[in-house]
Amino acid sequence: MVSEMTPTRRALAAVLGGRVDYVPPANPLAQTTTELMAICNASWPKAHFDSKMMADLAAASYEVCGIEAARPQFDISLEAEVLGCKLDWDKPDRPPVTGPAYTNPEDVTWPDKLEETGRIPVVLGAIDELRKRYDGMLPIIPLLTAPFTVAGHIAGVENMARWTKTDPEKAHAFIDAATDFVVAYGKLQAAYGAHILFLADPSASSSLISAETYREFVLPAHRRLAKEISCPQILHICGDSSKLLPYIKQSGIDCFSFDTVPVWYCRQVIGNDMSILGSLDVIDLMPNGTPEQVYNRTRECILQGTDIVGTACGVSYGTPLENLRAYVRACKETPIPRYDDVEDLIRQIGVGIGRNMKENVLGGMQE
């Protein structure tokens, strides 16, 4: 057992495949519940434009519930906005892009002083505020929208999907331009004090693209991020990414955050090539389940081999704080399974599933 670690050291060790004292509840998905926003006096859309309010809201889940991460930047549209897209601020929580900004990839440009452009200074200011406030003790894991999603925003999602079939050269050019921008912004986040970058690429979901499309168009961009940004990274892709896993593990990114893939299956396919983060359901379990159910599901994730426990996506506004606290408590109270290799882990999972059925989900919170 490793001696007691700080949240930052624990999260970094887990992301990079090292030893930890317990599986960290370092959730980089959005935790902006109504209760947390009221407690820290944050509101939409102000939290998108004020560095201190952004920092307060990013850290609220740690201060109130013990979740060991702070994630500034709350929307995946900021990058597209900087590149010229308009946003729908009638939906102020996570404003969507209203439409594409470019038809020609050669026209994609951004200002030289990126740190002074759009809402980027707000995010960088929040990172700096959090770094000073916690003296490096709390991992700062800002959102960074990944290239394929950014390309879809600035060129049109339907256009990008069509071009991967009809004009692959144009699709590649837009992705390359988006990657150049994301690398530049990611380097700024790291320079201002981010410990880990959270790469969100929802448009790379297998519900939208095939595994072959991921391999040809998305994987090269992910490899560039891993190579060119000197900061640990977590990649998140929504939906059922099971068919993408054989390629995702070739990306060079440190950790994969998954949605609906079973934990044991993700561990089996990924092996030890990456750390994995997942996966508490946010549709029913987190908003509607009991703390005991959340606790038990967290234990299952740990026993099935996840390196970090987090939610499958951002939690809904009505998620009870007691459910967030139960998830943290389960991480701290569940011993880490020790296995010499992944194959042995999978065999043990089979035994564990049978035992769960017999003992009514691991004996609940009495263990």
Curated annotation (Swiss-Prot):
Record has Methyltransferase as a keyword: yes
InterPro entries in the record: Methanogen_methyltrans, Mtase_MtaA_CmuA, UROD/MetE-like_sf, Uroporphyrinogen_deCOase
This protein's record includes keyword Zinc: yes
Enzyme Commission (EC) number: 2.1.1.251
Regions that span the bilayer: none
Gene3D superfamilies: 3.20.20.210
CDD domains: Mta_CmuA_like
Cofactor note: Binds 1 zinc ion per subunit.
Positions annotated to bind Zn(2+): H236, C238, C313
Alphabetically ordered keywords of this record: Metal-binding, Methanogenesis, Methyltransferase, Transferase, Zinc
Swiss-Prot/TrEMBL GO biological process terms: methanogenesis; methylation; one-carbon metabolic process; porphyrin-containing compound biosynthetic process
Cofactor(s) in the UniProt record: Zn(2+)
Family matches, as Pfam families: URO-D (PF01208)
Enzyme class: transferase
Catalytic activity: methanethiol + coenzyme M = methyl-coenzyme M + hydrogen sulfide + H(+)
Function noted in UniProt: Methyltransferase involved in methanogenesis from methylated-thiols. Catalyzes two successive steps: mediates the transfer of a methyl group from the substrate to the cobalt cofactor of a methylated-thiol-specific corrinoid protein (MtsB), and the subsequent transfer of the methyl group from the corrinoid protein to coenzyme M.
Assembly mode: Homodimer.
Protein name, as recorded: Methylated-thiol--coenzyme M methyltransferase
Gene that this polypeptide is encoded by: mtsA
